[in-house]
């Protein structure tokens, strides 16, 4: 493991960077190496306004699969006679196979605006991420932190997230062809001749959107104690 951290600041702004590298061995299957770096800054825009942004990059190589995920593949052979207009389909359940490299870039922005009259602060967050697997995602978060008497605060919040699916994601794979068989071993699937190079049915790689609304009620006490109660509808 290795890493470094750099801070360059002045009275109204701050720039920071943090490259790092980790190496880990995935149990049973192979090695994975992650190389990451980040660069960010914060800027005071006014007496009651602060803006910050950071850019993060992650490069991963090696074993990137989830060893607990299986993928269902079906081969509908058009050469076989159909039964009730359906082709005979041979099914296989196999471990997922992801590309050996993954490059991901993420941009995060945050704006805090304080309002004196209601004694409240508005927090706006926006994040955009994309990678070379075809996934693009966006996140929007809005928090209104309202101060009350006796150290109480009430925070209504909203979050929205959306992403599209990876290039090699499908809930299942169906091919209109006979399944490739290993030479000299009839009946055994030849993985090297599959019609796709990578495949996964991991729902985290699927396209989806989600929104949540919530409320947090908190109170600060002496000795840095804090009580917090909240709920969220997802």
Can you annotate each of these PLM segments?
Residues 1-5, 120-130, 231-234:
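Transmembrane beta-strand segments that form the barrel wall of outer-membrane beta-barrel proteins
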Residues 51, 122, 227:
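A broad, low-specificity signal marking well-ordered, structured residues that form hydrophobic/aromatic
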Residues 37-43, 109-113, 126, 142-146, ...:
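Residues on the lipid-exposed face of transmembrane beta-strands in outer-membrane beta-barrel proteins
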Residues 54-112, 130-139, 151-234:
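Outer membrane beta-barrel transmembrane domains
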Residues 44-48, 116-118, 149-151, 222-224:
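Outer-membrane beta-barrel channels and translocator barrels
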Residues 22-24, 139-143:
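Short helix/strand-bridging catalytic loops that position acidic/His residues to coordinate divalent metals
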Residues 4-78, 94-96:
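Solenoidal tandem-repeat scaffolds enriched in leucines and small polar residues
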